[in-house]
A protein has these predicted regions:
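C-terminal His-loop and adjacent cap/lid subdomain of alpha/beta-hydrolase
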Residues: 1-124
Length: 124
């Protein structure tokens, strides 16, 4: 993942939208549909992106979901994918407000799930 490797070197606050099970990454980087391998990949990816966030400039944020999708271009991703009952759209708005309003700690609590139970995905 090029972006996550570059993230600690970006000199301005940024907001990552990332799925633990990004369909392109699972297919192209992992190359397996084995459930155990995919789950391990998702855990490793989560550790990698949260580590990058911890090394990033203050004000940076992350919306890390556990849904199977690639990119955030579909309208359903903005409205239906949630972490702790916060949609992608709401998390992005929270982050934009936090950059100017000093709410970064609250944003990180809301957008980085602790355990699998914190994430919900829409039914296909």
């Amino acid at each position: 993942m090029f972006a996550v490797n570059a993230a600690p070197h970006i000199p301005v606050p940024y907001f990552m939208l990332q799925s633990r099970y990004d369909t392109w990454q699972v297919g192209s980087e992992l190359g397996s549909k084995d459930e155990s391998a995919v789950n391990a990949f998702g855990q490793a990816l989560a550790a990698h992106v949260t580590g990058a966030l911890a090394q990033s400039v203050a004000g940076s944020g992350l919306f890390l979901d556990a849904c199977s999708h690639h990119t955030a271009m579909g309208d359903d991703i903005w409205k239906d994918v949630t972490v702790d009952n916060v949609t992608t759209r709401e998390a992005t708005a929270l982050w934009l407000g936090s950059v100017f309003g000093g709410c970064q700690a609250a944003l990180r609590r809301s957008c980085i799930p602790v355990g699998a139970g914190a994430v919900s995905c829409p039914l296909a």
